[in-house]
Amino acid sequence: MFIAQNWVTGLLGHSNPGWSVTSEELDAGYVRVGFETEGYAAIPATTGPLVLGVVESIEELTEFKKPIRHCFVNVGQANGTGENQSIICGARNFAEGDTVVVALPGAVLPGDFAIGARETYGRMSAGMICSAAELGLADKQNSGIITLPAESGQPGDDARAVLGLDDTVFEVNVTPDRGYALSARGLTRELASAFNLTYTDVAEDTRVAGIELTAPEPAGELIDIDVREETNTVRFGLRKVSGIDPNAESPFWLQRELMLCRQRPVNAATDVTNYVMMLLGAPMHAFDATKITGGLTVRNAQPGEKFETLDHVIRDLSGEDVVICDETGIQSMAGVMGGVTSEISNETTEVYFESAIWDPKTVARTSRRHKLSSEASRRFERGVDPAIVEVALDMACSLLVEIAGGTIDAGRTLIGEVPTMPSITMPVSRPSELAGVEYSPETVVARLEEVGCTVSVNGDVLTVVPPTWRSDLTMAADLVEEVLRLEGLEAIPTIVPTAPAGRGLSDAQKRRRAIGHALAYAGYAEIIPSPFMNPETFDVWGLDADDERRNTVTVLNPLEADSNVLSTTLLPSMLDAVRRNVTRGTGDFSLFGVQQVSFERGNGVSPMPSVKQRPSAEVVAELLDTLPEQPLHAATVGTGNIEFEGPWGSGRAYTYADAIESARIVARAAGIELELANADELPWHPGRCAALLVDGHVVGHAGELHPQVLERAGLPARTCAMEINIDALPLRENLPAPVLSAFPALHQDIALVVDETVPAEQVRAVVEEGAGELVETVELFDVYRSEQLGEGKKSLAFSLLFRAPDRTLTDEEANVARLAAAELAKERLGAEMRG
């Protein structure tokens, strides 16, 4: 949240006359009570003559492409002559008689923008009539000439004090559990504790903010309002102001506070709602009352209903969205944004102010579903003080009448009561026990009362009722945190805990780390696969309806609407990474990822036990039964070349054999031997897919992806991938160390001709078995096909490494073993030895 230093210090100064603080001290104060500040910055300085001026006359210059105005401005004696200053200006939001801010020649505005006198548009322009953006008070979209009340000062007076340019803007990081602090009211309460100041709640005494409430006491209902129970609306209030000046602009002091809070001034009614929100933390909405027909209904939207929000986007509504309707249709998306049909305009003379307390979960889901985060939704998601509704309505009405005239209707519609806050019991010694610091009972009670709690003392036990704006205080631990936070976390001693026995990585963690290291050493780059996916991916792949991978867990509030299920496979995320890299010009790479996947178990709906007591064994069992199965998977994907062309020779493309080898890398790191078998498993190519087996059980697949899948997904041809279930591999607690021999090895090759349908891995396994105990490794190094071999035949060449642990082998011994391997291959596979 952005907020100006002078605003919070001014609110605190009302009850603490003479108190002042530097920006550095204020920053430390925020941190002291647990708020991080992203930073703070002074309003950029303007040097030289910056004065008040009164526009005496305006000459419209119409001979140019855009409308230009030649103004004569009374700046008193600030220009040294007392004559009216000639200034060219293109802005249209000021008139003769207005008090404006003038930068005279010699002034330098933020951004080193020097002001001088020069001829332009055929006239002499000696100065600039300034906008808020040009003085560093706002961004460009908030730009507009600053107009001030006539009583702001005399022509020629220095404008800096009037504008409050000696100010600093803080960006305070408010955590999700402390929504009350998204307001000047909440932050000043915290700062009062940080600096031991007297605090007066602006909601109880609005004069702290210089605002007099002029709204009459409510007398009767304003209009009929039907709030449906299914919307979970806590409170809903409405008041009306009639007969306002539609062209009235918000005073500069109000616009200034909004601009420094990064809010854009729009019109008087809207500015008032935004100011009340920033001051009290109560989001409001203003309707053009003449555009509301009949009463209002707060209901859930019908699925498929459409609604155009104030940002001129037509939105398809869900049955979970809460809307405010009149007899003609939807007028607002509750807690998020209003609609164009009842928008405040420059013709609005009657205004309905709405202040409500919406269900935080509903607002959060609506905001995410429509990707529409607003200042209002941010506050409702975190919780808004339900007791603030009446004050917010009266303040908004009073401010609007002060700015734009009109009268406040005596009627007020108010639905819902302020909820009773549940009490919390806590031993007064509990903060001391947890922190290891002695806090007196008086200190504990005082700190809780500073927060706004009502505290009753009964011996050594406190009964605490949290204030309505602190819905995050639900248990004793929350109260302990408040005491520790306000007393200072730096007072808690730092003690290194004694490490428990058996520390270190578990065997499963060691295996996961070993697999990651092995794949990285093999040249694969690691990515972190997304835990979410689009279920339509399975349709692109052509999976059967009963495929296990379609057994997904649906996410109720997904970060992205189309990625609304938990991933049952890592490949969608891996292939998305391939697509992104290829579209950005990178075509040769191989990636790996290790991540849990999730399969739905039971009906996928878990109970919601109370947090006030430990759940029973039955509830715990029910919770565990509904948790998804989350096995750990590893996946690799490769495209383009794995070996690059250069002076050393031609390159080599990443093939299905490399994908299979990546599976072997995983297995070796886990101390497991894989078996391979032909497989027909989408999204892989049926003729280039291998099933990965351990003890006869399929644990994964590897190979080249199906050409149609690649085409539909916009991926390069011949892209290959592997995915394996790591948790399905037997866990080897102690991997055997390799046996090293001091004796030399013998290398021999063997080439076998087999049918095209016989897998190379099957041949390799038979050769290894037939070669006996003397063979250390059997590796395929060549696959050959030709007319001489015959149709449907292929030649597989293997390199055999022989070694004996206790002697030097002879060539004859190695040759006997090689021939034995060939004989077994002939017997089992019909293989014929070549050459």
Curated annotation (Swiss-Prot):
For whether the record's keyword set contains ATP-binding, the answer is: yes
**Biological processes annotated in GO:** phenylalanyl-tRNA aminoacylation
Q: Which SMART domains match?
A: B3_4, B5, FDX-ACB
Q: InterPro entries, alphabetically?
A: aa-tRNA-synth_II/BPL/LPL, B3/B4_tRNA-bd, DNA-bd_dom_put_sf, Fdx_antiC-bd, Fdx_antiC-bd_sf, NA-bd_OB-fold, Phe-tRNA-ligase_IIc_bsu, Phe-tRNA-ligase_IIc_bsu_bact
Cofactor(s), by name: Mg(2+)
Q: Does the keyword Protein transport apply?
A: no
Please list the residues that bind Mg(2+): 472, 478, 481-482
Places the protein is found: Cytoplasm
Q: Give GO terms: molecular function aspect only.
A: ATP binding; magnesium ion binding; phenylalanine-tRNA ligase activity; tRNA binding
Cofactor notes: Binds 2 magnesium ions per tetramer.
Q: Which GO terms describe its cellular component?
A: phenylalanine-tRNA ligase complex
Sequence ranges assigned to domain tRNA-binding in this UniProt record: 44-160
Kindly give the Pfam families that the UniProt entry links to this protein: B3_4, B5, FDX-ACB, tRNA_bind, tRNA_synthFbeta
The FDX-ACB domain extends over 741-834
Locate the B5 domain: which residues?
Answer: 419-494
Q: Which PROSITE patterns match?
A: B5, FDX_ACB, TRBD
Query: EC number(s)?
Result: 6.1.1.20
| Main localization, broad class | cytoplasm
What's the top EC group for this one?
ligase
What does the record note on quaternary structure?
Answer: Tetramer of two alpha and two beta subunits.
For this protein, the record's HAMAP family field holds: Phe_tRNA_synth_beta1
UniProt-recorded name of the protein: Phenylalanine--tRNA ligase beta subunit
Q: What is the primary gene name for this protein?
A: pheT
